[in-house]
Amino acid sequence: MRKANKFSTEKRLGYKKRENFMGFDVGTHRIGYGVIYWNKSGPKILKAGMIVKDKKFSFLKDFKKIEKLIKNVKPKLVVLEKIYFSRNVTNALSVAEVQGLIKYACEKSKVKFLEVHPKSLKLKISGDGNADKNDIKNSVNYLLKINKKFKTDDIYDALALALYGSMFI
């Protein structure tokens, strides 16, 4: 694994006026989310966790959970991973539907969103466009100085997406 990129706090103006950046990692059964902000010492975690999707496929319940989270956090930008191709079309469609809910919640809350290609995310966060899940986890731990372990990779991926988004504002 290559050494993770060290963000320059001098280049980041986000710590002068606190801005939150949010990432969503959408899966077929759960949604990982991560929210970061910057201060003088670098990026910090504000909130991270999981939304378990409704088993009865109630889009309204899922939407309300997502909308409430976005309204509470008030992010400057929400970042999603772009769906580029999937061998399992059913899973890809399920993920796309939830991403649509997230985009709608962003539009409704007047929050900008960005979709990023997985290779671009991996390159920016770990320095390697072909990084695996473990490399991303290690890079996120390093960049955010995380002391605890999260239960799933979805949370690490969501935090990586939030970090990615914070570099573009």
Show where each model-derived region lies:
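Phosphate- and other anionic-substrate recognition elements at nucleic-acid/protein interfaces
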Residues: M1-I169
